[in-house]
């Protein structure tokens, strides 16, 4: 090894090349592709300087290590890129999130593909694929990158269809579909990936979100107001005692249905804040006006009853707070209003006329 080569080695060039080799030998995960592309871009920028500085026979070890590293980087990057589609397909066998939230693989893959199509990585990945194809004596086709990314996203679509069918609860399945379709529409609109998939694809996901949202409401919260029927109570036709019994019965049925629905859905998650707030507001608009009106009109019938708190179980304000606290991600639940039914009960002895006035 010549004098200059020794100085270069002592300066850390060999250690740098060895470090790059170590990265190529580590586990081949999708996120590693970006690191390999960064390494390739750095080596490519230094190529002319490397050739000028280390082109002599004395630097043969550095030359060999550099060529080996470049080959490892290109082979590794290409291998990971072509493996992404396979990995997405394999994820189809995994169960969907129990809380109906967006699977991490969906959000990570869409974000990942957006980066690959972006101005920072697309030219580098294209160059890597061109070189890799030439080594295999294959002609590089211009659309190979976008076609593969499109295929990956369509595989994600198929995963969503499969995961939806894995839920045993229709409303949870619909909530999951709402989450995923809204994520694909909202997060990809105006992005490189969204442009690739096209406006019709984006619009389709927006429409699917609306469709499953309608089913979600129809199969869950829209069923609650029917328990507060006014039939037979308009003129207290059966007498005050009969009317009171009927009101108590209907309030009890409403409370049981509400408690069960709230208990079940309080563990579900809508990660996107705008969708969560809109969903909660729609639930409030579906349930609260009917409950408020019913309590204003018929609350006084049970106010003198010793067990009134069993029937007039919630204040309107308490009910609203509970509904608005639904679907929070786990990390946001702590320190916020939990909305437990026990926390919104009217204590024994509280004048129910205050409840009636509070709903005005």
Predicted regions and their residues:
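Long alpha-helical rod scaffolds of large eukaryotic non-enzymatic complex subunits
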Residues: 1-360
């Amino acid at each position: 090894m010549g004098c200059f080569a020794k100085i270069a080695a002592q300066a850390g060039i060999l250690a740098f090349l060895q470090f790059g080799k170590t990265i190529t030998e580590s586990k081949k995960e999708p996120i590693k592709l970006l690191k390999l592309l960064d390494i390739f871009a750095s080596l490519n920028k230094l190529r002319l300087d490397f050739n000028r500085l280390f082109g002599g026979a004395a630097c043969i070890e550095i030359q060999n290590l550099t060529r080996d590293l470049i080959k490892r980087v290109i082979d590794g990057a290409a291998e990971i890129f072509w493996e992404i589609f396979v990995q997405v397909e394999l994820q189809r066998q995994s169960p969907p999130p129990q809380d109906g939230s967006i699977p991490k693989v969906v959000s990570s893959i869409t974000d990942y593909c957006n980066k690959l199509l972006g101005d920072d990585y697309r030219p580098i990945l294209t160059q890597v694929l061109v070189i890799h194809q030439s080594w295999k004596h294959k002609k590089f086709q211009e659309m190979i990158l976008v076609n593969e990314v499109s295929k990956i996203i369509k595989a994600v679509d198929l995963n969503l269809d499969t995961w939806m069918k894995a839920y045993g609860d229709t409303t949870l399945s619909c909530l999951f579909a709402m989450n995923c379709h809204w994520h694909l529409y909202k997060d990809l609109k105006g992005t490189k990936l969204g442009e690739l998939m096209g406006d019709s694809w984006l619009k389709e996901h927006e429409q699917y979100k609306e469709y499953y949202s309608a089913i979600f409401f129809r199969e869950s919260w829209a069923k609650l107001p029917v328990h507060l029927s006014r039939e037979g109570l308009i003129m207290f036709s059966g007498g005050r005692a009969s009317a009171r019994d009927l009101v108590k019965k209907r309030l009890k049925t409403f409370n049981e249905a509400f408690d069960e629905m709230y208990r079940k859905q309080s563990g579900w998650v809508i990660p996107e804040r705008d969708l969560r707030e809109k969903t909660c507001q729609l639930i409030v608009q579906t349930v609260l006006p009917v409950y408020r009106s019913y309590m204003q009109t018929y609350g006084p019938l049970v106010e003198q009853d010793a067990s009134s708190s069993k029937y007039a179980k919630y204040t309107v304000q308490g009910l609203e707070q509970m509904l608005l606290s639904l679907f929070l991600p786990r990390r946001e639940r702590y320190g916020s209003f939990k909305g437990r039914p026990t926390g919104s009960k009217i204590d024994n002895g509280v004048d129910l006329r205050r409840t009636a006035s509070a709903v005005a």
